Amino acid sequence: MRLRSIQFENFRNHRSFSFEPEDGINLIYGQNGSGKTSILEGIHYCALTKGFVSAADGECLSFSAGYFLLTALFESSSGIETAVRLSYTKESGKKLQIDGNELKPFSLHIGSIPCISFSPPEIVIVSGPPGERRRFLDNAVCQSDRRYLDNLLIYRRLLQQRNALLQQLSQSPGKDRSMLQLWSENLASSAASVTAGRVRFLAEFHPFVELLHRDLSGGQMPSIEYRSTIGRLLEPVPESELRERFLQRFQENEQQEILRGQTLSGPHRDELIFLSDGRESKRYSSQGQQRTFLISLKLALFQYFNEKIGETPICLLDDIFSELDGKRTAAVLDILEGCGQTLISSADLKNHPGSAVHHLQTTPSTRNSEV
């Protein structure tokens, strides 16, 4: 997959801007505040309908603008073109068109344009709370497994409905509980599907992480553990068994869940643990080691997607080299040479041999790219 062109209107600090990257490695170079990250974020929006920077759609509007518009043309490795038009207004929200046709729900677009991103704030995937790791895992599996995305959306809907019933029972202790058993059974089946998809993905993904991280870290051995609310899951388990274990846990926790008005077990509370040489990275690794682990995860995703779905992802790397030493920078660049189209933002021209350089210069209303 490659991006042939993208146009920005009123997207962050790009009032009117067109960008045409080349194949291979592209360096987007400019001063801080010139809009380098915004270019990557706009591409990410077109690929996955959201930015990799944690922000609401409205925060991406240029100052005083009432809308933003992104139009992009992608080309697959087999030569098939996909035209993406994504717009947002304060009044009607976000709209997506693919090849001129409006697409709903947006989830139908996920996986069509495989995309890997890296940005410094994503260090929380390694160092932050469990929700950040679950989000990373879900985003990764959704791009490579359409069934998983469908199962995840079903699970979230069932969880919301079961929680609503638990809140009703909490507020009315004498209310009939017969419906709770039905919701528990439905949620247990859905939780089993989501959990099985996650564990299956990790079993396939881990060898890619192991190989890359050992190279980038100087020989450290990575491992990934999936700690479910029904116990540690170190290898794939039949869905039927997972369903029974979830249902049993719901029944065991029923009284406490009613008191608290929420579901206390399930994929929404599971934990993903990253370890390096057997020690939890979140607790025992330095910030530099955590960053290296994150880069290993992201580059491993590229290799996994390339093999799993048969399409080369686009790599969007925001300021990836800022805290890496020369040895690790060289190692990452060696890997990126084989990663298809890669876009790197940087305020530094050093350590980017062989890159197509796009220098961002600013005017009051426009951002221009010059090679």
Swiss-Prot record:
It comes from the Bacteria. GO terms for molecular function: ATP binding; ATP hydrolysis activity; single-stranded DNA binding. It holds the Pfam family AAA_23. This is DNA replication and repair protein RecF. PROSITE patterns: RECF_1. Transmembrane segments: none annotated. One of its GO terms (cellular component) is cytoplasm. PANTHER family: DNA REPLICATION AND REPAIR PROTEIN RECF. HAMAP family: RecF (MF_00365). Keywords: ATP-binding, Cytoplasm, DNA damage, DNA repair, DNA replication, DNA-binding, Nucleotide-binding, SOS response. Its main location: cytoplasm. The keyword Cell division does not apply. It is found in: Cytoplasm. ATP binds at residues 30-37. The keyword DNA damage applies. The RecF protein is involved in DNA metabolism; it is required for DNA replication and normal SOS inducibility. RecF binds preferentially to single-stranded, linear DNA. It also seems to bind ATP. Belongs to the RecF family. GO terms for biological process: DNA replication; DNA synthesis involved in DNA repair; double-strand break repair; SOS response.
